[in-house]
């Protein structure tokens, strides 16, 4: 499944779980930024193409931007939620 289509389903799932608009926006934007990075740097468009190594490269990229640890951890929390959803829905 296209990673961006999975993201749209993830957003809908978050809305159905009645998460706040702010939380949904954060999950969506942080995950979208990762997907854009993955496509640009690794040519990844399908959710099942993402491996742990790609996420590690993304973390390394975030660290190179001198972001705070709290902000970086928040991004990782969003990615964990997205991939947990993808596994739950058996897209991965």
Language-model region placement:
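N-terminal core-binding DNA-recognition domain of tyrosine recombinases/integrases
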Residues: 4, 8-25, 29-92
């Amino acid at each position: 499944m296209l990673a961006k289509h999975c993201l749209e389903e993830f957003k809908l799932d978050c809305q159905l779980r009645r998460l706040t608009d702010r939380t949904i926006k954060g999950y969506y934007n942080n995950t979208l930024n990762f997907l854009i990075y993955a496509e640009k740097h690794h040519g990844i468009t399908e959710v099942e193409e993402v491996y742990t190594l790609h996420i590690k490269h993304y973390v390394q990229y975030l660290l190179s931007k001198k972001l705070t640890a709290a902000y970086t951890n928040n991004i990782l929390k969003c990615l964990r939620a997205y991939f947990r959803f993808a596994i739950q829905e058996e897209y991965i």
